[in-house]
């Protein structure tokens, strides 16, 4: 029996090793077969064989054993695209109870798609809408759906929760109908006339409506208040503010509020983390390379990351030929004679000396100054002024370059025949390329020289328009260089006066468009109004004159009235400028209005304006431009002084009539 059992075992193992064991399928249940003919030892052998046989992996072979027509494919849950668009976002923790109802109403009743909820509570810095803000963003299906959705949502909030929402960008029902009706009427008129309607923004919609529900009081809300201190003014309001942003699909993709307000931990990924790690490693490497290799300190050095130094934009930017030291702390030798305070005092002393020289130049009359400037740029010692200036410069290249540049600017401003604007531009390029700094006063003098009309003898090689473009571009480049050096020139009246003079210079070309120049003058006035400059001093009076010469009458009288408000009263010089500029402008209607209104106002000033030679000549020229005749001219101002001055005005008018 033992030999038979071993033979059966060997046959079974050999059969198992030759072919893989297959699991058979039966339609009848397994039967427990019992035979009385077999002995107990045979059952033991079968049991032993059953335990020794390898157990197949049913999970691995189930797909192979089951025929293809009996295999059941796994169920793949697919969501419809429309259902995905209409999913309601999850409500954050500690949100007001009204939040879930608002989301359901926006999705089911209003019909907004792709809704996103942004929890902006606890943000630092705070959003512009407040500290505790929950923002809901949704897309409407069109412009009409956008307006209807916002209107119905506001009405639902008022009727259901007694809230007072504010919808920014929403037009009322009647207002929207009126605007649409007017737009359709304009389109019909344009089509009947054979033209196309204006496609500019009609103000009907911007594709974006912001519904500010307001603060929703909820005692369950945990306020994330900052400890110590407060922000803003007034009492601290509790509750959470809910804001619903409704967009059209195009406007939502353009604005992309989700990217703006999403927390950084949600938008960062492995790539951004990798970039931050690389940037930090690069910063550490640069920090180690900038640390000195040896030091004499007894304490160990530490690599403490420090933020980069902040640049003060109010400081001037200077050029330097010295290489920047890599070490943070620079050791100054005890034997060094270099002292920054002494250098600063020396530079200030040089500027004071230069300003004293040019004050002397400004004290001379134009004819005397033209004579003192010599024959041209090569003349350095024919006059006393040139000898003093170049002897002061000495061998200092900076001082010599500055003096040459400023003397050329003064000569061009006086229309000296030996100096040209091209030579002045060449000197300016040499000055800036050498790294020499110009003060604000010097830069304005140079730019003003470029805007002075040229002599006729210098206008032969190029056309007038080309010369005008060169002059304006050169002046603006000088101002650009001054702004790059750190000067805050935007608050200076002289900058805008330069722009006005550039416009006047552009009108020197006969082909120039006066309407275009007037439009640019209006833009300059708008910029000055936005900045809020004070109308005081000589620069403000120059701005006033330039505005009237460019046809900006409203801008002229804006400064004229502001002068009386800021300074208390107008002087005889102000009235002389008033009448003289109206005469130079050449507009008869404006000149007549000026004479009718402001001659009588001179007697109401405190003190009253008395006649002198300058104002008498200005009134006569203004009356002549206004079209009045000397025989019929009468002053509306009744005073003994002005009655005596009337014959002088009439005589001046007759002289002008004879000259014409």
UniProtKB/Swiss-Prot annotation:
Task: For the region Disordered, give the residue spans.
Answer: 287-313
One GO-annotated biological process of the protein: mRNA stabilization
**Under what name is this protein listed?**
ATPase synthesis protein 25, mitochondrial
Q: Matching InterPro entries, A to Z? A: Atp25, NT_sf
State the family it belongs to: Belongs to the ATP25 family.
What PANTHER family does the entry give? ATPASE SYNTHESIS PROTEIN 25, MITOCHONDRIAL
Q: What does this protein do?
A: Probable mitochondrial mRNA stabilization factor.
Could you tell me which residues form the transit peptide?
A: 1-32
Topological type in the membrane = Peripheral membrane protein
Membrane spanning residue stretches: none
Which organism does this record belong to?
Talaromyces marneffei (strain ATCC 18224 / CBS 334.59 / QM 7333) (Penicillium marneffei)
Please note every region of biased composition (Polar residues). Answer: 287-302
Task: List keywords of the entry alphabetically.
Answer: Membrane, Mitochondrion, Mitochondrion inner membrane, Transit peptide
The record's Gene Ontology cellular component field reads: mitochondrial inner membrane
Q: Where found?
A: Mitochondrion inner membrane
């Amino acid at each position: 029996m033992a030999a038979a059992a071993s033979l059966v075992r060997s046959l079974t193992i050999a059969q198992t090793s030759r072919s893989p064991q297959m699991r058979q399928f039966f339609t009848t249940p397994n039967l427990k077969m019992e035979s009385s003919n077999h002995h107990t030892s045979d059952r033991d052998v079968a049991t032993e064989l059953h335990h020794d046989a390898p157990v197949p992996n049913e999970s691995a072979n189930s797909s192979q054993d089951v025929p293809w027509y009996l295999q059941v494919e796994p169920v793949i849950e697919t969501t419809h695209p429309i259902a995905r668009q209409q999913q309601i976002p999850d409500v954050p923790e500690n949100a007001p109870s009204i939040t879930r109802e608002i989301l359901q109403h926006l999705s089911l009743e209003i019909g907004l798609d792709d809704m996103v909820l942004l929890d902006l509570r606890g943000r630092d810095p705070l959003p512009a809408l407040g500290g505790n803000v929950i923002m809901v963003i949704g897309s409407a299906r069109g412009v009409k759906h956008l307006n209807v959705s916002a209107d119905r949502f506001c009405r639902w909030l008022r009727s259901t929760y007694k809230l007072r929402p504010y919808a920014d960008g929403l037009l009322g029902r009647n207002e929207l109908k009126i605007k649409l009706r007017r737009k359709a009427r304009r389109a019909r008129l344009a089509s009947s006339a054979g033209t196309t309607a204006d496609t500019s923004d009609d103000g009907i919609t911007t594709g974006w409506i912001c519904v500010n529900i307001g603060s929703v009081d909820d005692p369950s809300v945990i306020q994330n208040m900052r400890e110590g201190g407060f922000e803003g003014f007034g009492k601290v309001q509790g509750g959470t503010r809910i804001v619903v942003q409704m967009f059209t699909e195009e406007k939502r993709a353009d604005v992309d509020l989700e990217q703006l307000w999403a927390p950084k931990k949600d938008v960062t990924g492995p790539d951004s983390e990798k970039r931050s790690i690389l940037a930090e490693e690069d910063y550490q490497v640069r920090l180690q390379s900038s640390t000195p290799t040896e030091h004499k300190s007894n304490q160990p050095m530490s690599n403490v990351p420090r933020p980069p130094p902040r640049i003060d934009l109010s400081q001037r930017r200077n050029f330097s030929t010295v290489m920047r030291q890599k070490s943070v702390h620079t050791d100054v030798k005890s034997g060094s004679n270099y002292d920054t305070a002494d250098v600063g005092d020396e530079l200030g002393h040089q500027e004071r000396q230069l300003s004293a020289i040019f004050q002397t130049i400004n004290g001379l009359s134009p004819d005397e100054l033209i004579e003192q400037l010599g024959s041209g740029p090569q003349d350095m010692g024919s006059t006393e002024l040139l000898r003093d200036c170049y002897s002061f410069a000495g061998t200092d290249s900076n001082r010599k370059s500055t003096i040459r540049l400023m003397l050329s600017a003064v000569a061009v401003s006086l229309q000296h025949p030996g100096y040209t604007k091209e030579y002045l531009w060449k000197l300016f390029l040499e000055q800036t390329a050498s790294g020499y700094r110009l003060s604000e006063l010097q830069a304005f003098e140079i730019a003003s020289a470029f805007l002075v009309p040229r002599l006729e003898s210098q206008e032969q090689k190029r056309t007038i328009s080309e010369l005008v473009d060169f002059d304006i571009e050169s002046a603006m480049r000088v101002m650009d260089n001054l702004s790059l050096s750190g000067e805050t020139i935007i608050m200076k009246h002289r900058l805008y006066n330069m722009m006005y003079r550039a416009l006047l210079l552009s009108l020197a070309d006969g082909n120039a468009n006066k309407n275009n120049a007037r439009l640019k003058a209006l833009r300059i006035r708008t910029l000055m109004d936005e900045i809020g400059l004070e109308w005081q001093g000589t620069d403000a009076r120059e701005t006033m004159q330039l505005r009237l010469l460019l046809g900006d009458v409203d801008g002229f009288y804006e400064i004229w009235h502001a002068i009386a408000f800021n300074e208390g009263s107008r002087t005889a010089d102000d009235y002389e400028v008033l009448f003289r500029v109206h005469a130079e402008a050449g507009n008869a209607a404006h000149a007549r209005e000026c004479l009718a209104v402001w001659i009588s106002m001179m007697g109401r000033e405190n003190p009253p304006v008395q006649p002198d030679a300058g104002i008498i000549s200005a009134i006569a020229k203004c009356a002549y431009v206004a079209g009045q005749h000397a025989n019929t001219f009468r002053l509306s101002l009744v005073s003994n002084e002005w009655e005596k001055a009337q014959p002088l005005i009439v005589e001046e008018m007759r002289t002008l009539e004879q000259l014409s």
